[in-house]
Amino acid sequence: MKHLGRHVLAEICGCDFDILNDIEKVEEIMVNAALEAGAEVRECVFHKFSPQGVSGVVVISESHLAIHTWPELGYAAVDVFTCGDKVNPWDACNYLSERFSAKHMTAREMKRGIIPETYLKEVANL
């Protein structure tokens, strides 16, 4: 069955505290991860928490990359959602794991936009 996109959810552990707590560094790494995967970056929004932690989103033409960091735990929760077949979300996740100096990453991929054929036929008739 066809799908519209791929959504990888990654648990990245054993990361460098200073990197995960640096908003500029996290944004730079996230943008470069999108580019590494072959995506076209549109916009970025990042926020620094007190006393530590960063959350952010990189909006790409093909969907998005999102991150929430817990530097005190060396942990980052990452989503990479891509539409089409030109961008590989796994390339972005592997890049992030490497650049965060992670000791471990687990990830799962979910196909998104699996629309039943009967519904597509209904929509086509509107």
From Swiss-Prot:
**PANTHER family on file:** S-ADENOSYLMETHIONINE DECARBOXYLASE PROENZYME
- Name of the featured protein: S-adenosylmethionine decarboxylase proenzyme
In its UniProt entry, the species of origin is given as: Pelotomaculum thermopropionicum (strain DSM 13744 / JCM 10971 / SI)
The residues annotated as site (Cleavage (non-hydrolytic)) are: 62-63
Q: What is its EC number?
A: 4.1.1.50
Gene name? speH
NCBIfam families named among the record's database cross-references: SAM_DCase_Bsu
Q: List the disulfide bonds.
A: none
- Cofactor stoichiometry and binding? Binds 1 pyruvoyl group covalently per subunit.
Q: What class of enzyme is it?
A: lyase
